[in-house]
């Protein structure tokens, strides 16, 4: 069972992933290390808010999605 708070957090993360497009950065990484590339990585930086009504702390959640080319 997912708590209401967790559901909201997952929804925010999913929304941020849909809205981000960081392909250019990945291409730069790939060009730099083209000889020995095994993994292509998409890096998503999502802003999530933690705290109660009065105090909101902004934290960054970094998600790495690794694609293996076989």
Swiss-Prot record:
The record's keywords, sorted A to Z, are:
Malaria
Q: What else is known?
A: This antigen is expressed in all erythrocytic forms.
This protein is called what? Answer: PPF2L antigen
Q: Which organism is it from?
A: Plasmodium falciparum (isolate Palo Alto / Uganda)
């Amino acid at each position: 069972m997912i708590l209401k708070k967790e559901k909201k957090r997952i929804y925010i993360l999913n929304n941020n992933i849909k809205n981000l497009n960081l392909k250019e950065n990945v291409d730069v990484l790939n060009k730099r290390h083209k000889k020995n590339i095994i993994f292509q990585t998409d890096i998503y930086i999502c802003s999530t808010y933690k705290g109660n009504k009065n105090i909101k702390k902004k934290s960054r959640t970094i998600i790495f999605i690794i694609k293996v080319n076989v």
